[in-house]
Amino acid sequence: MDSSPNKKTYRYPRRSLSLHARDRVSEARKLEELNLNDGLVAAGLQLVGVALEKQGTGSHIYMKQKNFSANDVSSSPMVSEEVNGSEMDFNPKCMPQDASLVERMFDELLKDGTFFWGAAYKNLQNISLRRKWLLICKIRSSNHWGKKKVTSSTTYSTHLATNELAENAHFLDGLVRNLSTGGMKLSKALYKLEKFLRKQSFLQLFLKDEIYLTTLIEKTLPLISKELQFVYLRCFKILMNNPLARIRALHSEPLIRWFTELLTDQNSNLKCQLLSMELLLLLTYVEGSTGCELIWDQLSILFTDWLEWFDKILADDIAIHSSLYLNWNQLKIDYSTTFLLLINSILQGFNNKTALEILNFLKKNNIHNTITFLELAYKDDPNSVVIMEQIKQFKSKESAIFDSMIKTTNDTNSLHPTKDIARIESEPLCLENCLLLKAKDSPVEAPINEIIQSLWKILDSQKPYSESIKLLKLINSLLFYLIDSFQVSTNPSFDETLESAENVDYVFQDSVNKLLDSLQSDEIARRAVTEIDDLNAKISHLNEKLNLVENHDKDHLIAKLDESESLISLKTKEIENLKLQLKATKKRLDQITTHQRLYDQPPSLASSNLSIAGSIIKNNSHGNIIFQNLAKKQQQQQKISLPKRSTSLLKSKRVTSLSSYLTDANNENESQNESEDKSKDSLFQRSTSTINFNIPSMKNITNMQNVSLNSILSELEFSNSLGTQPNYQSSPVLSSVSSSPKLFPRLSSDSLDNGIQLVPEVVKLPQLPPPPPPPPPPPLPQSLLTEAEAKPDGVSCIAAPAPPPLPDLFKTKTCGAVPPPPPPPPLPESLSMNKGPSNHDLVTPPAPPLPNGLLSSSSVSINPTTTDLKPPPTEKRLKQIHWDKVEDIKDTLWEDTFQRQETIKELQTDGIFSQIEDIFKMKSPTKIANKRNAESSIALSSNNGKSSNELKKISFLSRDLAQQFGINLHMFSQLSDMEFVMKVLNCDNDIVQNVNILKFFCKEELVNIPKSMLNKYEPYSQGKDGKAVSDLQRADRIFLELCINLRFYWNARSKSLLTLSTYERDYYDLIFKLQKIDDAISHLNRSPKFKSLMFIITEIGNHMNKRIVKGIKLKSLTKLAFVRSSIDQNVSFLHFIEKVIRIKYPDIYGFVDDLKNIEDLGKISLEHVESECHEFHKKIEDLVTQFQVGKLSKEENLDPRDQIIKKVKFKINRAKTKSELLIGQCKLTLIDLNKLMKYYGEDPKDKESKNEFFQPFIEFLAMFKKCAKENIEKEEMERVYEQRKSLLDMRTSSNKKSNGSDENDGEKVNRDAVDLLISKLREVKKDPEPLRRRKSTKLNEIAINVHEGDVKTRKDEDHVLLERTHAMLNDIQNI
């Protein structure tokens, strides 16, 4: 092995002082002498050392063995004290046999640090023993060159220290002067300073006096040229080992600015930039966060330029810099590593809030692109482990900053998508905030904001939920598709980008169309399956019923038949009993009439006879109870001095409206009785009403016999099932009975309200068969009458007789068929001579219920829960609401009887019914008439107020058609005739996408050409007679080439193209309308609040109306605003409803929000939408037919130049799919609409009702909102008025406590206070005070009289206050 020092080279991995190999100067320093006790310096040096340490074997810089100058070697100290004192011969050719001695000497040489340091210490350990001896010999021989041998090592060291101090002092003497001047002196001074600064003794002397460091920073810095940058930076890197120098450099703003500007200087050497970054990195650890702040303040100014320059460095080719840098790859690795270390150090030096701002600034400058490039470039490089670690650290720091800030903002745990992935399903993440924070101040911030705004518009738009869901699914699918399928390379070429863009465009359009169609078909299929399930459930229910009917055995049917036969026989017997009862009733009536005519006595005698008759009946154990009751009533009636007119039964609501049924039949009978004595008739009427028999008159018996008894039985059964009084409207027999004013007692409403129940007593009587009645008593003598009058006490104990027993027909089955009793004796005349019976004493008991056995199988069955739902009756006359009632409430919302009951209870408990009675009561007719007269008078008073070449060419078209050609084809005027024709035949996008041109091609004049026009163009089309088409004008030429030559299929072609160009727009318009209707239907089906509102409105209306309805139609909602209050004409029934709902039922008030989507349906006609859907379907079917079997089905029938089939064959299938989807959607929507209409009591078969189904909802919502606004404004005005009034009262009370003079001034102020407040409230310039100033003058006079002792002062003041209050109230109402 050649050991010549001139030929051998060394592998030296570290950067040398010189920028080029030929100019390198030896470098040395003593690491063991550095002050490593400073923790900050140690951390910084350790961080830099780790980052720049080489990993494994890599490239090395091969340098010559002659690496140090003579000056460096001559000034080096002794390597070893032991070696210096020995007489060993350091001959390179004669190596000692003791290898351990060579190793020890070489280790001492390395530990000295004068000649080798840093990575050289590690690398030189691996060289051979022979090589180590050569280095020792070279250094030892140089050390003894030209010097005398020192006898003692101590003496030598003393001389060496003395020389070193002298040399340092001599160098410092001229250092300030040399550093302040430029040129060669500055260059020599810097190089020499860099060498001296490696010595600890010189470093202490240099820093002992601040003038040296100040001169180096302030005076030398402006003089630094490009050649001196590296040595200048090396000086500061050595100075950074001292804490005082670090602090001084950190607080020198010009120095820090020079370091940062050097990073962006593209003319400077990269090694200088790398060294500058290392110095900035070291300074970020000084004084905690202060160092980071000072460094970032200067670095942020030039960070954008620096990052761009760094990107250029990473993108440049290696061959470009091979001539300047020996190892370009290693330099890029070192540069990138230091860059990442500096960024991470800055982020770690701030708190999270400031770090977030810095991170957003870095994002804005596209630092993520740079990091992504580094990650891709050095992902598999074994020498770039530090880079990958720093990238990972940057990402983790970024995530930590985002997580901490989001946690602080939202008070939640880790919300960043990259953290806590396992908790995504269990905890909702605030992805929107995280996304915005992550994209803030970056290039992607604007696109992400646009995407979020688009998503917000989708959610906030009026689109139905189904449409919004499809759009969101589409967006999500597209994003996943694009992310997975279109990954763009790191640096794609322009051609690759263009090609990928074209592929994306094609695939994107096709994917979007397919995805939309699949989403729509899925929605329709889902709804169709739901509809099928409902129908299957109904079919299974019907099958169960059918099976139940079929499974009935014959024995069961025979048993039912036997029961029916027994019921028929029983009813036959009952009919016979009724006939016998009619005969008995007729006979009894004759007796009563005869008795009435024979015994015509005065009232006093009749009273005595009644008392005696009552006592006789009382003594008889088998007497009738009716006479006892009559005696009691007679004793009570004697206390009344004047007779009172009783209320007739005909006055009742039921009988009054029903008695007119037989009015015409009874006129003849009534006319025969007009000649009789009126007094007798009145007495007879009172007598019969007192007896309380429901007996028809003799004159009506014949009419009653002609009426079937089944009608009576069915009606009585109906009343019995309802538990109420029988309805006499449906029975002409009962109506005829009730129409007789002489036989029916007068029924008082008070007696009914008092709840006098006679039915139980009457029902119990027939249980024991009564004995035969006693014979009619003779008329009493006059003496007995006088004696009876003299003993009122004895008469008072006689009770009035009870009603007669019921006929056998009305007894229960337990009584059996008992023969009717004999008729009762005729009553004495005195019984009919009562003196004005009271209204409270005359009671007609209701008809007793029929026995269960008499119920007819054909009788009407009514749900008792429905008929019992009545609001409490009211005595006041209220305004009526004209309902459009629903007769059949089955399967409608009105079928919910439970909610109806709850609604009535709540309205009654909250006092809503009482408020209705006060607000909507009927006014008296006189007031209404006066008001109408006043209004009519007011109304009457108010009623009294071409070029020359074109002209030479031939044209057969009409002027109008030629002008239309020019107008519609003006955008293609630059094209020639044939160019335009070929554009049409090629189906160019400019033609196909222009709807106006396609519509023009479909005009009648162009598709249906008359024969006369064909004859004119025939020579040109066939080329006969030598006529050339060039002789025709432009419009005629186009007309000839297209409309005439292609007339066989031109009509079909034009209509097909027009359909294909417009079908998508029409499809989405119709789908949008249908989905709006679906959305409205779903809201109406899912709104329990609106259902509750309907029940409240109905029950309040039932309380006001005379007739109760089970349900109302939707049209009735619009009539609520026409029912005005009797107190204030500005208040309608709808105002009242709105206030009640808002105050009493705030949870129901949200129905307005539930139905807000219905407001948009006012412009949509259901019939029109349905017809458009069918028309669209038919149009697409015709299109498909044309291309399958029509004129456009075969290419040989078309012009060879025509490309229509190739252009539209894919669009036809798509149009057919959309047509089927649309018609399916339309059918499902109509099915749901029919169900909803039936639910609200509407007829789905009525076209008018279907078209206007949503209109009542829209109008009602508009009126309801208007009423709500007016109510709130009125309440606010009243609140302001009450505040002003309370303020006035407080001031008045305070003024009364003051003295007299102050009292006068206070009253004047109070009088003006309200007027001033009113004027401010109305905000008018003209003050309405002069009108009341006159009143104020009078008030002042009254106030003066108060001091004079007037007694009426208080009343006058109250009167004045009342007047002023009314005036203020009028002003507020005018507002």
Swiss-Prot record:
PROSITE patterns assigned to the protein according to its UniProt record, in alphabetical order: DAD, FH2, GBD_FH3
Entry keyword Phosphoprotein: yes
Domain GBD/FH3: 94-490
UniProt feature, compositional bias: Pro residues: 767-781, 818-828
Any coiled-coil regions, as ranges: 520-601
Limits of the DAD domain: 1302-1336
Keywords: Coiled coil, Phosphoprotein
Database matches in SMART domains: Drf_GBD, FH2
A GO BP entry: actin filament bundle assembly
Phosphoserine modification, residue list: S621, S751
GO cellular component: a single term: cell division site
Region (Disordered): 661-684, 764-785, 817-839, 1285-1309
Source superkingdom: Eukaryota
Domain named FH1: residues: 659-851
Molecular functions (GO terms): actin filament binding; profilin binding; small GTPase binding
Domain FH2: 868-1290
Protein function: May organize microtubules by mediating spindle positioning and movement in the budding process. Potential target of the RHO family members.
Assigned protein family: Belongs to the formin homology family. BNI1 subfamily.
Domain notes: The DAD domain regulates activation via by an autoinhibitory interaction with the GBD/FH3 domain. This autoinhibition is released upon competitive binding of an activated GTPase. The release of DAD allows the FH2 domain to then nucleate and elongate nonbranched actin filaments.
Other comments on record: Present with 259 molecules/cell in log phase SD medium.
Subunit description: Interacts with profilin at the FH1 domain.
Name listed for the protein in its UniProt record: BNI1-related protein 1
